[in-house]
């Protein structure tokens, strides 16, 4: 079932006619006139009290629902000021006079207690000392039901880290929590969210996280917390290449960040990380769920897909809706969603989400108003390339089938198994000259790299590029991508990066009308002919090819399988385009450097980082490929 951009535009226009009539005055001044604010320390079962800002409508004639967000990022402003969220992303609920609740999670800002990053869920709580984010949500909900005038229904939402707390709210078991919307939820910080991908440390993101002072000692609740000074002033590539080792980075970070110590103490997927995988306890979920994510979310794309799959496998009875748009991290609540970098998606997809999807979800489950969710076709998926919304009843879609793309000699890519013997492509990976993830000079990672032009990488001798023939028809790929490489390396370890790329026709260019729409009228200087749009990319640390818990080295020169998953795809490679696969072993400084020896990377010295000669096989006996579903 397809929702074209024309239909989408019509929906957005109709929505705006109804929304704007009622919500055009939801400004700061309007909120301050129509809401009161009180600040409460809500007691938890173990005696710890959590700071909570409660915004209640002045006109409480009609009881309304509670909408809540729990956050480690401040339930500010503290005191008399009102949160800007009420006239921004929560404005629809302010218009409906919802009770709006913002809470500092345990151990953060004005809340008491000890903060624990992605605190593990305790499935079988034995006493009031067994507390987690789910129990804190339960206790908060219980207090709200007994102390705030409402209709008795509570909804919880949150993006990114607050998305993790939303997932925990869904596991709390409180009967008043009827609807939960985890958005780009942190789910597994080792396997694919934020700070690791398949065991590879996402070093740029991690250092930025540390600079936000997460995990620094906080003896007492506080309204202010000083951010650490930036670790470097020059560009990120130069800084991380100069420092190179995790030992050097540890010296810079210092000894006051508990979570950095945890990272260094747990390089493998051990019990520490497994306990922090939110998917493990997604079972028998009672509230309705609206799960939201971005196809180009550089931080928590993995977690969004992971929570959805866990819900369908472990809690199939849950009333679940799932939407993935052409968005970067959190774009649905703060951006137009019509482009990312040089790539244009068409209509304003974010307004469609806020007013047609999220708002209707909470109105139905909390207020008993609005259209009934279409649970038979519960998936809204934006197909990039085609730039259209489609609705599905399962993922991957029923009308899709697996297809293999085989790497071939001479840089070719096809659906035919290679027939030659002793056929491989080779490159040398040098940690002293790593492949950058972008050709731009930046102080920090940009969100646009997720669709960035990859032509710069093809020019590198340490990047292999395989391209299909020009497509004679549209090819829409959906679902998880499985990379299956047959490799031989000259050392005992290496990383493997696989990128799936959409290469535009040589004569492609945007019309001036389109260029003006997403470039704010500024001249579009990028040459779009033969543009290589990154659609998907993922890294795998070779030592984890057989087990994430128990790493093992390579035998130099031996042909070895390295198989790993890339995040799901929903992209149409249009007629006249090419499908391109790139393979490399560094992606810097997005990823930390591998010394390319089977040693403890956290303790590696600069002299330990050595070159590795890497062969990628494409022969009949050992063929490398990617497997993904193609929509019929």
Question: Where do the model's predicted regions map?
Answer:
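Glycine/threonine-rich phosphate-binding loop and adjacent beta-strand/alpha-helix elements that clamp
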Residues: 343-346, 352-357, 366-632
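Cap/lid segment of the alpha/beta-hydrolase catalytic domain
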Residues: 58-146, 194-195, 334-345, 505-512, ...
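A catalytic-pocket lid/entrance helix-loop region that shapes and gates access to the active site
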Residues: 81, 85, 121-128, 157, ...
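Mobile cap/lid helix-loop segments that gate and shape the active-site cleft of serine hydrolases
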Residues: 79, 124, 242-280, 287
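N-terminal cap/lid segment of alpha/beta-hydrolase-fold proteins
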Residues: 25-60, 467-473, 554
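Short beta-strand/loop motif that positions the catalytic acidic residue
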Residues: 285, 291-293
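Conserved alpha/beta-hydrolase "acid-adjacent" motif
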Residues: 298-305
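Alpha/beta-hydrolase fold nucleophile elbow
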Residues: 149-160
């Amino acid at each position: 079932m397809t929702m074209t951009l024309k239909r989408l535009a019509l929906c957005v226009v109709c929505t705006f006619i109804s929304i704007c009539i009622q919500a055009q005055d939801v400004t700061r001044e309007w909120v301050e006139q129509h809401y009161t604010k009180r600040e409460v320390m809500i007691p938890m079962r173990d005696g710890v009290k959590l700071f909570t800002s409660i915004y209640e409508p002045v006109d409480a004639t009609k009881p309304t629902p509670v909408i809540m967000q729990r956050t480690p990022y401040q339930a500010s402003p503290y005191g008399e000021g009102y949160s800007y969220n009420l006239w921004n992303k929560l404005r629809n609920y302010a218009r409906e006079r919802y009770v709006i609740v913002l809470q500092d999670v345990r151990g953060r800002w004005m809340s008491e207690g000890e903060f624990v990053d992605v605190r593990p869920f305790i499935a079988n709580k034995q006493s009031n000392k067994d507390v987690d984010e789910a129990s804190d949500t339960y206790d908060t909900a219980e207090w709200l039901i007994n102390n705030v005038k409402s209709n008795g229904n509570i909804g919880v939402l949150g993006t990114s880290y607050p998305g993790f707390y939303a997932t925990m709210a869904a596991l709390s078991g409180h009967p008043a929590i009827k609807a939960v919307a985890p958005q780009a939820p942190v789910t597994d910080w080792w396997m694919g969210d934020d700070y690791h991908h398949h065991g590879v440390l996402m070093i740029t993101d991690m250092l930025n996280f540390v600079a936000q002072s997460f995990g620094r000692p906080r003896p007492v609740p506080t309204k202010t917390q000083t951010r650490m000074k930036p670790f470097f002033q020059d560009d990120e590539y130069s800084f991380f290449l100069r420092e190179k080792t995790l030992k050097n980075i540890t010296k810079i970070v210092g000894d006051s960040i508990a979570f950095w110590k945890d990272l260094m103490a747990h390089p493998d997927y051990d019990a520490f990380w497994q306990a922090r995988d939110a998917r493990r306890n997604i079972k028998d979920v009672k509230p309705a769920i609206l799960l939201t994510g971005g196809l180009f979310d550089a931080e928590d794309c993995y977690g969004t897909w992971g929570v959805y799959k866990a819900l369908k496998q472990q809690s199939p009875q849950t009333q679940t809706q799932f939407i993935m748009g052409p968005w970067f991290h959190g774009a649905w609540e703060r951006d137009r969603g019509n482009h990312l970098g040089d790539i244009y998606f068409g209509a304003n997809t974010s307004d469609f989400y806020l007013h047609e999807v999220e708002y209707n979800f909470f109105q139905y489950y909390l207020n008993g108003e609005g259209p009934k969710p279409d649970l038979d076709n519960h998936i809204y998926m934006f197909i990039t390339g085609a730039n259209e919304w489609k609705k599905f009843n399962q993922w991957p879609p029923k009308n899709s089938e697996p297809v293999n793309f085989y790497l071939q000699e001479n840089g070719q890519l096809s659906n035919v198994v290679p027939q030659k013997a002793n056929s491989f492509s080779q490159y040398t990976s040098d940690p002293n000259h790593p492949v950058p993830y972008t050709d731009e000079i930046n102080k920090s990672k940009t969100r646009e790299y997720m669709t960035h032009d990859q032509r710069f990488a093809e020019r590198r001798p340490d990047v292999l590029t395989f391209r299909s023939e020009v497509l004679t028809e549209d090819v829409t790929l959906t679902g998880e991508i499985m990379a299956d490489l047959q490799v031989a390396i000259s050392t005992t370890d290496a990383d493997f990066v696989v990128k799936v790329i959409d290469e535009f026709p040589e004569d492609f260019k945007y019309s001036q009308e389109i260029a003006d729409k997403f470039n704010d009228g500024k001249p579009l200087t990028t040459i779009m002919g033969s543009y290589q749009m990154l659609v998907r990319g993922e890294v795998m640390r070779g030592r984890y090819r057989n087990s994430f818990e128990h790493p093992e080295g390579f035998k130099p020169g031996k042909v070895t399988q390295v198989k790993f998953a890339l995040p799901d795809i929903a992209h149409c490679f249009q007629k006249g385009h090419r499908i391109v696969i790139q393979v490399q072993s560094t992606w810097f400084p997005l990823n930390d450097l591998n010394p390319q020896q089977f040693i403890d990377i956290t303790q590696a010295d600069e002299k330990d980082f050595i070159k590795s000669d890497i062969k990628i096989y494409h022969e009949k006996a050992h063929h490398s490929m990617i497997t993904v579903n193609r929509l019929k």
